[in-house]
Amino acid sequence: DFAKRLGVSTSGSVDKVAIQLCDFVEADFNRKLDEPSKIVEALAPKERKELWRKLDIFPGGIHGEIMFATSSCLTNVDGYYQSLALKAMRLGVAMAYQSQIVNEYCQDVLYGIPRPHKMRVDLGVLDPDYVNVLPNGHEPFLGFTMVQLARQPEWQRKATDAGAKGLRIIANIETGQEMIQRWEMDGTFYGFTGNWIMQEAVLASGCVDLFACDMNCSMPIDP
């Protein structure tokens, strides 16, 4: 349905449609600055699009928008507050639709739609008798893959052979929030520690065997 909404052909296998969707999104990201984004055109409300065009803040490709907006902040490039405000709003539209909304939809397709369910939370999910792996950052793809691997008997055996009771994947900060929205807890995907503020306490617990950082929001400290 998401591919169809963007005007991507849904004929063929699931893998073929997925590749076509990725190609479409990538092409839109790299669209020229003065070439309107097809993603924004497809997803934004009609009345908003009309206003954005009137204000000249309907964005092109997000990569060009980022370069245009950030370079405008350089000395003697654009010091007029109204112009900078409009560029910030234009970049905001691009980020909301081409980055955040598309990213969430794609994660929903891959891992399921978020639904309410029970989840173990806080530092009590960390048990020193287990090998505790914490994916940390903003992109849950690594974390989901770790859960899939940890559920396989061979990876559990590696932990027990080393003297632990087993291997657990513990969700953490933004990556963890994406994970716990979509997948229910079990003996392997055990729970959620908390948000960014708890990161030092999590590491100070001495229960973390692997702090798997996918990108930002990972403190540059040595446990």
Regions inferred by a protein language model and the residue ranges of each:
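Metallocofactor- and cofactor-centric catalytic cores in central/energy metabolism, strongly enriched
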Residues: 1-223
